[in-house]
Amino acid sequence: MELKKMRGALVLLWLANIGVALAHINGYEDQPLSKIAIHKTTLALRDSASLRARPTTLGTKVCIYIYTYIYIYYTGEDIDWVTVVLKNSEPHADDWIGVFSPGKFEATLKFELINQRSDFSFALFSGGLSNPKLVAVSNLVAFANPNAPVYPRLAHGKSWDEMTVTWTSGYNIDDAVPFVEWGLKGESRTRSPAGTLTFGRSSMCGGPARTVGWRDPGFIHTSFLKGLWPNSEYVYRLGHRFPGGSIVWSKLYSFKSSPYPGQDSLQRVVVFGDMGKAERDGSNDYSDYQPGSLNTTDKLVNDLKNYDIVFHIGDISYANGYISQWDQFTAQVKEIASTKPYMISSGNHERDWPNTGSYYDETASGGECGVLAETMYYVPAENRAKFWYKTDYGMFRFCIADSEHDWTEGSEQYKFIEECLASADRQKQPWLIFSAHRVLGYSSDYWYAQKDFEEPNGRESLEKLWKKYKVDIAFFGHTHNYERSCPIYKKQCTSNEQHHYSGTVNGTIHVIVGGGGSHLSKFSQVQPNWSIYRDYDFGFVKMTAFNHTSLLVEYKKSSDGEVYDYFTISREYKDVLACVYDGCEPTTHSAV
């Protein structure tokens, strides 16, 4: 095999499997794969070294693996385990496949593979990460159907009675027509067509997404399930119909539709940011880039029955230009996103790239410039390139901002934010929630402590909107920790209460929930008086609306799922109507 072709094959292998794990050694913005100089690989093949992978056909059975925290993981058409038998009579300390230090070496290793629309092989390298030398290559292994429909992810449509299903496959529209078969549980089903998207290397804005990180994303399909009954159980499966009439199916999934806006029922929402991904086979033990990611995922999988919708508020996969990592992420959250609406926000690691219209002139997206997030996931935005949107869930109104585009007064997004807040019917939807990735409010993270405890220009334009429209809670990520403020306005607490808030909406509570999984961020040494609770750990927030007057907000750690901080809001409609401070409308007396 020519070295050029070999390099291409090894990039495919490395990005798809073993390498997903290695090396976040230094640098806040690094992607682990960026540490591997795979483009410098030279041939050093030896007859004395060999690898053999088995089985060669994957995804033909269903097994159950039980991990710590009793996480049951199903393999099938999209995920499976491979055993790699390695022999090397001339071991060196800088040899690597995944993570090991060889001595006299003959070993059997196990790797978990996901279906990425192609076959796989394993390779043994010497020379470390910066000067890799190819020593041996295994046989090929492949899934029984590499093109199968996989990794469904649900999201709200643009109306409360619409659910969207997005998934990935290897089938273009000319190969097989995509659709979803769905219906109320136990009743007859109907079929809804799906649209198909993809993109090429030329859509990437720079490297590594356009260079060593590029990988064909396959085809992304989205179907719109409309006219849903409120609070009802539905089942669905993904299908592709070939020209001859035969159909390839996914397995059967289920979801519960949204309540009618304003419906008085138990409603539970999970919020976190900055989760990323990790590998269950241990291949990232060399350096954990998102060490809390699997704990957060597993806690949410184990608790599926106890929440209704998820908001992942930016920094989704941390692919940073290594395209294969989006498949890895969608596979990791499949058990969640296939059952619950999985609503995402745009973060710096999804969008930012110089001279592409992002508000920050940074390179955090690795050249993706928003294309991956906008294609791999659906959100009910008018234009997904402008990643702001509103969505309703029962008694909640969510206004989701895009911190990577201009939000300051007079901007297009500012007008959207005001319209979203102003149009909420607080008699029916008392719980008004604002969210963005970067901290546009308050945080005492180490970096923000040097910048007035906010993103530059963060709250100056927005705070008057939060006050005018009486926003209950503002959620942010970006800083990898948890922090909760008092109800606050213009840097001043508007209540001395710590946990139980009631009466007039006189300030917005700011919650930083960026500890979803990526490496943690330190706090400033000084804790401002508005900072009620801080935690340097991984976790997520769960909101529970019991009715129109009672809301519980809990912060849970990913390590044990226990509650470490909480607060409640008790409020009647007249409290929402009441004016506060300089936000009172003018009044007069009638003539009679």
Predicted ranges, named:
Residues A144-I512, G516-F523, I532-R534, K542-A591:
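Metal-dependent phosphoester/phosphodiester hydrolase catalytic core
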Residues M1-K4, S590-V592:
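A positional/structural detector of protein chain ends, strongest at the extreme C-terminus
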Residues E2-N145, G282, S287:
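Extended, solvent-exposed regions of the mature portions of secreted/cell-surface glycoproteins
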Residues Q527-P528, D537-G539:
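C-terminal structured "cap/appendage" subdomains that terminate the fold
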